[in-house]
Amino acid sequence: MKKIIYIIACACMMGFSSCADTFLDLEPLDSRTDQVYFKTPTHFREFSNGFYSQLFGWRSGITGHMDLQSDLVTSRNGEQSDIGYGALVVNDKDACWDIYNSIRTNNILLQRAESYAGDPREIQEYVSEAHFFRAYNYFSLLQHFGGVPIVLVPYDTGDSRLKAPRNSRYEVVDLILSDLDKAIAGLPIEQNIADADKGHISRQGAKAFKARVLLYEATWR
């Protein structure tokens, strides 16, 4: 009898030890890295939601798609006089360069989608959003600078490719249109977007933005 009790006790201890190992072997929930993220469609959804928070407001200084860059709207605070007096200071930390931070997040999702172990259709919408926002961001850069360096993967800070020369305007436009075509193919139509997700980019919205890009380039070419 004692032998049976001893065997049962040992088995229970081994079971508890196994459960404890499983319980303690958890991913940190307070700080996630790329290596432990992007394993479920929910991860991709949560990450893609961040694209919308990176959009610039109308008072941010990035107004490339708005009438604030035209002669329809002007400032009353005298900033234009700085140009005449030669007092305008060039700022190399302008918000324009922050667009590359947004492009990096787009590239991270696209890179992780390539190694996603599940059904690609589960994350198709979020991948399409990444393509759309990368096109949107490069169009902002195009409007400000013309040709810019094209970055398609999330480089580390010490990567020598970060100092690559700028690509031509035509190459940037080709990338924008290619990304928009991929976005259009995978985004849902507006009628199929749930009420809780209204405001997310739809297929119709991506088509409208592509039309804007084509019209903008038609005036330049």
Regions found by a protein language model. Name each.
Residues M1-P28:
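Bacterial Sec-dependent N-terminal signal peptides
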Residues C19-I62:
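Membrane-proximal, proline-rich intrinsically disordered regions
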Residues L29-T33, G84-L88, V153-S160:
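Short linear capping/connector segments at secondary-structure termini
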Residues G147, V151, D197-A206:
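Aromatic-lined, polymer-binding surfaces characteristic
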